[in-house]
Regions:
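A ligand-binding cleft/hinge motif common to bilobed small-molecule-binding domains
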Residues: 68-69, 84-95, 141-145, 168-202
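Short helix-initiation/N-cap motifs at beta->coil->alpha
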Residues: 60-72, 117-118, 156-167, 202-204
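Extracytoplasmic small-molecule ligand-binding "clamshell" domains
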Residues: 14-85, 94, 231
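Ligand-binding cleft/hinge of the Venus flytrap
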Residues: 33, 46-56, 138-158, 188-191, ...
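Immediate post-signal peptide segment of exported/extracytoplasmic ligand-binding proteins
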Residues: 4-37, 117-118, 123-129, 250
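Periplasmic-binding protein-like
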Residues: 24-25, 104-111, 163, 181, ...
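A conserved helix-loop-strand patch within extracytoplasmic ligand-binding domains
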Residues: 55, 63, 86-90, 94, ...
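Extended ligand-binding regions for polar small-molecule ligands
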Residues: 40-53, 113-116, 123, 128-137, ...
Length: 250
C-alpha cells in the first residue's frame, strides 16, 4: 500500500496545496462536526486519499440551503472536489465529473410510530405529508408519490434543517421523512419515538466528484480509491460508518 501511495502521489498530486474537500454538514454518518473536529465516512476516506496523493486536506463546509448548489463551488474554486454522500445523477453529471461510485445505498422512510403506527412504508402515505431536504435525491421520489396521489404533499426543508424535520415528525409538521438509509439510521438512535419503517426505496450510486474537465485530479482520486477498495479499507469504512444501509457497488 505504501508503494501504491507513493506512485499515486507522484503521478496524481501535482499541487502542493491542500486538497480542498467540499461537504454539506451535518450529514452523519457521512460527515459531521464534533468538538474535536470533523468525523465520518467521507472524512476518513478523504483523509486517506489525500495522504496517498501526498497532500494535506482541508474540509470546506457548504453553507447553502439547496444541496444541488454545492456543485457551483467546484467552478468558483471554493474546493477541488466534493465528498458528501453525493448520489450520481444525470443532472449532477452535467455539473461535475464523478469518479467511480464508492457506495450503493437507497432512500428510507422514517415516521413517529406513536403518531402513525400503521405506516409501514411508502404504500401507506396517502393523505400524509412527506418531509425532504431541498436538493436531496429524496425530493423527486416524494414529488412522484404526490403526483400519483399516493401522498398529500411534500414539505421541503433547507438542507441544514434535518433535525427540524425530524422534530416535526413528532410535532406534526410533517408525517414522514425520506433520506438515505445510513443517515436515518444514525438519527433515530437517540429518538425512541422515530423508526425507519422502510429501506431500499431507491438504489443510488454515490461518488466523489471534481470540477468538469479536471481529469488529472479525477484520475488521481480514482486510482487512490481503487487501491483503498482493493486493500479492504473502503469495505471496512462502510461497515464501520454506514452499516447495513449501504454496500459496495457491484
Amino acid at each position: 500500500l505504501l508503494a501504491t501511495a507513493r506512485v499515486l502521489g507522484a503521478r496524481g498530486a501535482e499541487s502542493t496545496m491542500p486538497l480542498k474537500v467540499g461537504a454539506a454538514l451535518p450529514d452523519p454518518p457521512f460527515e459531521l462536526m464534533t468538538k474535536d473536529g470533523p468525523i465520518g465516512f467521507d472524512i476518513t476516506l478523504m483523509q486517506r486519499i489525500a495522504a496517498m496523493l501526498n497532500r494535506e486536506w482541508q474540509l470546506v463546509p457548504y453553507k447553502g440551503t439547496d444541496f444541488n448548489g454545492i456543485f457551483a463551488g467546484l467552478n468558483d474554486g471554493s474546493y477541488d472536489c466534493i465528498a458528501s454522500g453525493a448520489t450520481i445523477t444525470p443532472g449532477r453529471q452535467k455539473l461535475a465529473d464523478f469518479c467511480a461510485p464508492y457506495v450503493v445505498s437507497g432512500q428510507s422512510l422514517v415516521v413517529d410510530t406513536t403518531r402513525h403506527p400503521n405506516v409501514r412504508g411508502t404504500a401507506d402515505l396517502k393523505g400524509l405529508v412527506i418531509g425532504v431536504q431541498q436538493g436531496n435525491t429524496s425530493q423527486p421520489v416524494a414529488d412522484k408519490l404526490v403526483a400519483e396521489h399516493r401522498a398529500a404533499r411534500v414539505r421541503v426543508y433547507a438542507y441544514d434543517e434535518i433535525e427540524t424535520a425530524l422534530d416535526d415528525l413528532s410535532s406534526g409538521g410533517c408525517d414522514a421523512f425520506m433520506k438515505l438509509a445510513p443517515v436515518t439510521a444514525w438519527f433515530v438512535r437517540d429518538r425512541p419515538k422515530l423508526k425507519v419503517v422502510e429501506t431500499g426505496i431507491t438504489r443510488e450510486l454515490l461518488g466523489i466528484c471534481v470540477r468538469k474537465g479536471d481529469t488529472a485530479l479525477a484520475d488521481a482520486i480514482g486510482k487512490a480509491q481503487a487501491a483503498l477498495m482493493a486493500d479492504g479499507t473502503i469495505p471496512g469504512l462502510i461497515k464501520q460508518w454506514l452499516g447495513t444501509g449501504a454496500a459496495l457497488p457491484q
